[in-house]
């Protein structure tokens, strides 16, 4: 059940970040991660860059690690997904990526939840891409 929710969060976060949809991101991220995402979105906007993304799907996902501290629980998940992405400048010139090429992406995301929380929600706290 956790893994299914993590997959939904993964797709939502990737799509929301590409669109610059800060309202959809906030409930899925820790405060620190939210600050990082907000900063990246502001930076992209200040440079008049547009991110285009088509999420093809998740090829696989697996829990790689479970950790617990006195205060929180952590799940580390490896996602292998396929996306089409590019960045364009204000004149619609492609400056990064390829709008016609499917790319395989491998991400390792860590989710956390406070032990004392009454909420069943998990929050993205760390991202590693390869």
Predicted regions: what they are:
Residues 1-3, 68, 98:
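Short, solvent-exposed beta-strand/turn "edge" segments of beta-rich domains on protein surfaces
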Residues 30, 82, 116:
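Residue-level marker of positions within ordered structural domains that often coincide
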Residues 13, 22, 77-80, 105:
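Extended aliphatic helical segments
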Residues 49-89:
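Surface-exposed, charged secondary-structure patches
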């Amino acid at each position: 059940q956790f893994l299914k929710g993590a997959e939904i969060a993964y797709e939502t976060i990737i799509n929301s970040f590409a669109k610059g949809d800060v309202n959809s991101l906030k409930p899925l991220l820790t405060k620190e991660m939210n600050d990082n995402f907000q900063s990246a979105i502001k930076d992209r906007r200040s440079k008049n860059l547009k991110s285009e993304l088509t999420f093809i799907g998740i090829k696989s996902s697996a829990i790689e690690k479970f950790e617990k501290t006195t205060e929180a629980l952590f799940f580390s998940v490896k996602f292998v997904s396929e996306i089409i992405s590019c960045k364009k400048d204000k004149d619609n010139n492609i400056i990064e990526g390829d709008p016609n090429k499917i790319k395989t992406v491998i991400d390792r995301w860590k989710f956390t939840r406070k032990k004392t929380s009454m909420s069943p929600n998990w929050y993205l706290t760390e991202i590693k891409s390869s």
